[in-house]
């Protein structure tokens, strides 16, 4: 499976879509952690979903998708940007029993919320929140779109621990170019025949042809996707500054330096006592040089 996302639309209708497949990027996320099988699968669906959402909103910034719960899994989070970089992480309750391999989303997270964050480079951050009231991520996201009175949207997501894939259909606002008022109901009906195995196994163009060969579908050039972490020394320094001078100096006295690790990519960052003093005195001057 090639790590890529493709847009498509149906001529003379107000229906558009996207299809995504992930294998290497998915493996790069999972290789850094020893997650249970059910968590690996849910993270795959989350990665597929955030890639689809990023392509949908076309934001110059980052899109993140979080599931915050009270169950054995406390957090599932995936993030994407317009450059095609993806990353994801899960946090488990250390005292809870490991989830069963085929556990549903609700079985993993218990009472939970889904938080969608749009963080543009320039402009105001936006967050949308919806309660987890369905067993699948796709159904929860469809519920979010329905409740927020946005465009009618349907999603199909699948992951098996090795590969992840997804498809999105969306009904755009009606205009004069739409000469087929029944197109939305018809294309959704065709897509409901899609199985997880087909979504994971078939080439994207083959899959679209199999589903929509009687429609006038126009498929655009694919966009490559990959694992990429946005952590930097400057961002880590900014986060450390939030701990406050007293706490930072206490850590230095106890440990000789402040050391931390990115949860996403496991990059290691070390700040000496001198680095910390520079950070405290001049928080906006940039991160001290790596030692």
From Swiss-Prot:
Superkingdom to which the source organism belongs: Bacteria
Any GO MF annotation of the entry: unfolded protein binding
InterPro entries: Heat_shock_Hsp33 (IPR000397), Heat_shock_Hsp33_C (IPR016154), Heat_shock_Hsp33_N (IPR016153), Hsp33_helix_hairpin_bin_dom_sf (IPR023212)
Coiled coil segments of this chain: none
Subcellular location: Cytoplasm
Keyword Cytoplasm in record: yes
Gene3D superfamilies, per database record: helix hairpin bin, Hsp33 domain, HSP33 redox switch-like
Principal subcellular localisation of the protein: cytoplasm
Keywords tagged on the record: Chaperone, Cytoplasm, Disulfide bond, Redox-active center, Zinc
GO CC terms: cytoplasm
Disulfide bonding pattern of the chain: 229-231, 262-265
PTM field: Under oxidizing conditions two disulfide bonds are formed involving the reactive cysteines. Under reducing conditions zinc is bound to the reactive cysteines and the protein is inactive.
GO BP terms: protein refolding
Xref: CDD domains: Hsp33
A Pfam family of this chain: HSP33
Function: Redox regulated molecular chaperone. Protects both thermally unfolding and oxidatively damaged proteins from irreversible aggregation. Plays an important role in the bacterial defense system toward oxidative stress.
NCBIfam families, per database record: PRK00114.1
Protein family per UniProt: Belongs to the HSP33 family.
The protein's name in its UniProt record: 33 kDa chaperonin
Organism: Chromohalobacter salexigens (strain ATCC BAA-138 / DSM 3043 / CIP 106854 / NCIMB 13768 / 1H11)
The organism's taxonomic lineage, starting at the top: Bacteria, Pseudomonadati, Pseudomonadota, Gammaproteobacteria, Oceanospirillales
């Amino acid at each position: 499976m090639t790590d890529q996302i493709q847009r498509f639309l149906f001529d003379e209708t107000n229906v558009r879509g996207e299809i995504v497949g992930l294998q290497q990027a998915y493996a790069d996320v999972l290789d850094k952690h020893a997650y249970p099988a059910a968590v690996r699968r849910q993270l795959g669906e989350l990665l597929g979903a955030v890639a689809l959402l990023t392509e949908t909103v076309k934001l110059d910034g980052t899109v993140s998708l979080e599931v915050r719960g009270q169950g054995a899994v406390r957090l599932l989070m995936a993030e994407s940007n317009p450059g095609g970089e993806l990353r994801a992480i899960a946090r488990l309750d250390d005292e809870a029993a490991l989830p069963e391999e085929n556990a549903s989303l609700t079985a993993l997270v218990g009472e939970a919320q889904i938080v969608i964050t749009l963080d543009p480079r320039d402009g105001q951050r936006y967050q949308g929140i919806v309660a987890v009231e369905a067993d699948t991520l796709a159904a929860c996201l469809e519920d979010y779109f329905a409740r927020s009175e946005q465009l009618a949207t349907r999603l199909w997501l699948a992951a098996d621990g090795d590969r992840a894939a997804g498809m999105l259909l969306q009904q755009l606002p009606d205009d004069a170019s739409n000469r087929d008022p029944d197109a939305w109901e018809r294309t959704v009906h065709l897509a409901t025949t899609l199985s997880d195995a087909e979504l994971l196994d078939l080439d994207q163009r083959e899959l679209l042809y199999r589903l929509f060969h009687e429609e006038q579908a126009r498929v655009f050039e694919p966009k490559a996707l990959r694992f990429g972490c946005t952590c930097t020394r400057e961002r880590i320094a900014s986060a450390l500054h939030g701990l406050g001078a007293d706490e930072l100096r206490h850590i230095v006295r106890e440990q000789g330096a402040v050391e931390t690790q990115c949860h996403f990519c496991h990059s290691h960052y070390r700040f000496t006592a001198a680095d910390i003093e520079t950070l405290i005195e001049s928080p906006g001057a940039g991160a001290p040089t790596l030692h």
